[in-house]
Amino acid sequence: MKILVAMSGGVDSTVTAYKLKQAGHEIIGCYMKLHGKPNYHEENIQKVEKVANFLGIKYHILDLQEDFKNQVYMPFINTYKDGKTPNPCALCNRFIKLGKLLEFAKSLGCEKLATGHYARIENGLIKTAFDDSKDQSYFLANADKEALEYLIFPLGEMKKEDVKKFASTIEVLKSFATQKESSEICFVEDTYVQVLDQFMDTKIPGIVRDSSGKEVGKHEGYMHYTIGKRRGFEVRGAHEPHFVLKIDPKKNEIIVGKKEELKINEFDLEKINLFIDAKELDCEVKIRYRSRSTPCKVMINDDKSAKVILKEPVYGLASGQMAVFYDKDLVLASGFIN
């Protein structure tokens, strides 16, 4: 089978390419340039070239910087500007890795696209990975349903530690097993605020109010805060921790309160992405990547919006983040919290 493998220079994509080559497939590698970090790309391309030469495969360098900027980077900036919390990895997977890269794979005559994601595909649906601690099904849940039939995730049945051990047994790949893992958001080197600083003044002090509307302090600028944050702002006379409940970007104000005020029993979704045909779901939801699953009921509207009723309350729901719905280990749908 002719397969395009997304290669980043990391251990996961390297082992993915190696395993598929050993299984007898015709492999082509592809490195994606997504953002403007010349030294970053140069180092990674050298690693990809090293692996490609070792495996005896061709590789391509695909410049997707403009697409990445329009589909991922600027939406990231604008979502924070709107006082919401973005999920750039979900957008990148849909539009770039499983979008533009898949288009490129097809243009080369490849039957499948393989990546180093920790997840599984079964009967046209995304499943959680065997390694719960590395499961990436949450970030893949915004993928176009039509893309799933072309995807292969060879590491879905492996534990991360075993991937590293496997690489360490092959002389040429030993260095990949010990290299530092990439950060969660590839274009954020330190903090997201430093990224925002390139586009706007984030240090405009504003008012902190309690949930009754009373002014209780000052803050450093609303873009420094996300829902649930409990530090970096003033609350006069407070004797217990206060958390960000709401952000008002137009007024440059944040509303704070006690932890109990973060409790949510229902919420609305937009841009729902269904992998099964349904108008209602009785399932479990994750409201952020590392959150536990919560039982819920979902009522889906014709305009791709939905109402989610939780059977147990959750804390700190952030607009702009993605909610992902599961039936045990199967991904049923996703949507963005509104």
UniProtKB/Swiss-Prot annotation:
InterPro entries: MnmA-like (IPR004506), MnmA-like_C (IPR046885), MnmA-like_central (IPR046884), MnmA-like_central_sf (IPR023382), Rossmann-like_a/b/a_fold (IPR014729). GO terms for molecular function: ATP binding; tRNA binding; tRNA-uridine 2-sulfurtransferase activity. Keywords: ATP-binding, Cytoplasm, Disulfide bond, Nucleotide-binding, RNA-binding, Transferase, tRNA processing, tRNA-binding. The active site is at 92 (nucleophile), 186 (cysteine persulfide intermediate). ATP binds at residues 6-13, 32, 116. Disulfide bonds join 92-186. Catalyzes the 2-thiolation of uridine at the wobble position (U34) of tRNA, leading to the formation of s(2)U34. This is tRNA-specific 2-thiouridylase MnmA. It comes from Campylobacter lari (strain RM2100 / D67 / ATCC BAA-1060). The gene is mnmA.
